[in-house]
Amino acid sequence: MAAIAAVAARRRRSWLSLVLAYLGVCLGITLAVDRSNFKTCDESSFCKRQRSIRPGLSPYRALLDTLQLGPDALTVHLIHEVTKVLLVLELQGLQKNMTRIRIDELEPRRPRYRVPDVLVADPPTARLSVSGRDDNSVELTVAEGPYKIILTAQPFRLDLLEDRSLLLSVNARGLMAFEHQRAPRVPQESKDPAEGNGAQPEATPGDGDKPEETQEKAEKDEPGAWEETFKTHSDSKPYGPTSVGLDFSLPGMEHVYGIPEHADSLRLKVTEGGEPYRLYNLDVFQYELNNPMALYGSVPVLLAHSFHRDLGIFWLNAAETWVDISSNTAGKTLFGKMLDYLQGSGETPQTDIRWMSESGIIDVFLMLGPSVFDVFRQYASLTGTQALPPLFSLGYHQSRWNYRDEADVLEVDQGFDDHNMPCDVIWLDIEHADGKRYFTWDPTRFPQPLNMLEHLASKRRKLVAIVDPHIKVDSGYRVHEELRNHGLYVKTRDGSDYEGWCWPGSASYPDFTNPRMRAWWSNMFSFDNYEGSAPNLYVWNDMNEPSVFNGPEVTMLKDAVHYGGWEHRDIHNIYGLYVHMATADGLIQRSGGIERPFVLSRAFFSGSQRFGAVWTGDNTAEWDHLKISIPMCLSLALVGLSFCGADVGGFFKNPEPELLVRWYQMGAYQPFFRAHAHLDTGRREPWLLASQYQDAIRDALFQRYSLLPFWYTLFYQAHKEGFPVMRPLWVQYPEDMSTFSIEDQFMLGDALLIHPVSDAGAHGVQVYLPGQEEVWYDIQSYQKHHGPQTLYLPVTLSSIPVFQRGGTIVPRWMRVRRSSDCMKDDPITLFVALSPQGTAQGELFLDDGHTFNYQTRHEFLLRRFSFSGSTLVSSSADPKGHLETPIWIERVVIMGAGKPAAVVLQTKGSPESRLSFQHDPETSVLILRKPGVSVASDWSIHLR
């Protein structure tokens, strides 16, 4: 017993030292990230091997005599001219202007991982036909669209053309590399294979290959091929080197975006001579800005933009991935490019992209646009659209690590009412649970969680509690016992349950790649299983990269084993998506499939948009972190993840009051709006600041809540079409080169342009208003400005430049109450901003704000408002929808209007009625008072 007690004491000390070390990093707020904890490309052996291959003639040749053309795909064998290993290329034309390329081993020693559960369905194909052929190439025509694919045999290459214009080339630089599986080397002096240096995999069909000497030379094992060590961690690599890589050349393209998550510029940078962009979900403490290091999530989607074309590349691989970017115009200034143009330079701009992944197959979708909105639709057709969030989740969220107890929560709740500040959600971090045992409540601090939740519900507010995917190893903890007994944990390579260190101390990690595990997890959110939960409790998934304090790079060992025998290296980047998926499914199931979920996740992958919101992780209370939140969320929006935000105020350190105010002002115009703070920071609820800062924050909150109908409509459009809510300016103005690198301002939909104030002590900002023959109206003063131009605008502590584009109509709620649920039946005010042609258009989506009835019962309204010829018309934009609602039109504000002699309202079946109005000749603003018509009815208002 004494020995057992001593071991237990050592384990407690070990756990404490690890947690203190973790906290030391978090609390050592003068320190930046310790880069030595995270690999560079040179320290990642497969990246180093892949990157050592230089451009040249590819060693791969297509064997055209093996070409087979079926109804859905073309297949052809590829051979490596040195190793003689055969691969199989599967090429598919897809509907909606897409092409899919898959390359795998023809006869693998064991199957290679193919990423499941990301695509919403098998994409419908467009038939390929052979339209030309010679000894070294085949020309293929895609049945849908004016596209051709040229397959060149030697060296292997693919070219995609529209008519005679080259859109994209594959393997044009000869950088394709596919590390085939092989038997580990056996030293000559050893006669027993078990005595070899590498781990011996199980015998599988295909064993017994006898490579020729040329093959052996080509397959010479480099350091890290069969075993790799990083710091104190060893990766056994029982299946040897299995990396894949491929290059893509984009002629005519200079501007590329996407592949989040990185704390870097919106426009991706050239990586030659530096580090590639890394995609490997990691818990990075106090991440640095303006570098390509990996962060919490990975979306392997890249967008390329030019004046005349947009393209997308979706690299479907869940393993560690690096992306190299090169350009033949890198280093040239805008003046230099203009000079080339004026002098008739024949050099076509080109960007080259190189993808490198540690395992899996090559599986890539080429999305051919031609417009960026086409690319958005194409990607959404593959991986799904942004889930329609419940209305409350678009309101303001108040969080910190941690609110102490029930009394603290209720005091914060009351504080918002006492200071006339709206709030929808209060959050609880890890301290709310009993000893970090998730699905429980601390019996001392939160003895009556149902009473607390009921009190919040009476205020029409919600609570979010954290549920992380690491489970305390404790024989008295029901969650752990069930997972262990059902064999649902991730395993070590020897078959035991994997254990690592995280917040609870020793923890095991549920294997979310297992459908049984996901079903079990979802069931845990039922009200019977999650004691103390209620319908107004929602969930936050943190640490789901997964974070392992004592693991390599603060994550799981790559040779850990998942469902189906797959290694963690194969599935790493999809783990967080599975956690998000299972949690969202659990919240849906607990309501019998009626209620929409809200789940925030830190880790993500392609497809995560279907399950909820994400955020930019543990940022810092510094002005540069405020600035970087814009390109970080814009990059996510471009690849489908619209529901993004950054911790308002910064997670680490204490923000000065001015910074906190500016962060609220920016957060009010970002999709996910949550203030959050570290355990060691001072309390920063808005009413704790001096009155002038309180007033500025209150104004920001009011702006957010008044725009909720607009936000909700934008999210419905994102849900239906796949269009981003928060957009770079270039998305709306694809031919305006001035917008291509702008990342300090952005648009919401096509209507609002926002330029946050992100410099300390700023008295003004430079705002670029794009668009030939566009007009922009300041939403506060209604002053009209013409585009394109750059304006210097003075700002005060309480102001932030926001403009409404002429030609748009924005619906608003003007009666701000304590929460969104208190406002959902309030009347609407329409803000009509007229274009120079005197026209405008906008939409309004309404439903009950929280159920799936808009889908299952068509209980919704989608209204279209159009202004033309001095008439404002309301009509249904989707006749399938129907909704009984008390909401009516309270007011119409028309910017850019002259004074009419009369204003007349017409509704079906009713006589004309005159409306009272007020006109300001200085601002050209016309206000129509109380039309009094139902938002659900058809009507028209005529200015005479």
Curated annotation (Swiss-Prot):
Activity response to pH changes: Optimum pH is 6.5 - 7.
Q: Name one GO biological process term.
A: N-glycan processing
Could you tell me what this protein is called?
Neutral alpha-glucosidase AB
Stretches for region Disordered:
180-238
What is the annotated role of this protein in its UniProt record? Catalytic subunit of glucosidase II that cleaves sequentially the 2 innermost alpha-1,3-linked glucose residues from the Glc(2)Man(9)GlcNAc(2) oligosaccharide precursor of immature glycoproteins. Required for PKD1/Polycystin-1 and PKD2/Polycystin-2 maturation and localization to the cell surface and cilia.
Q: Which family is this sequence assigned to?
A: Belongs to the glycosyl hydrolase 31 family.
Q: Identify the catalytic residues.
A: 542, 618
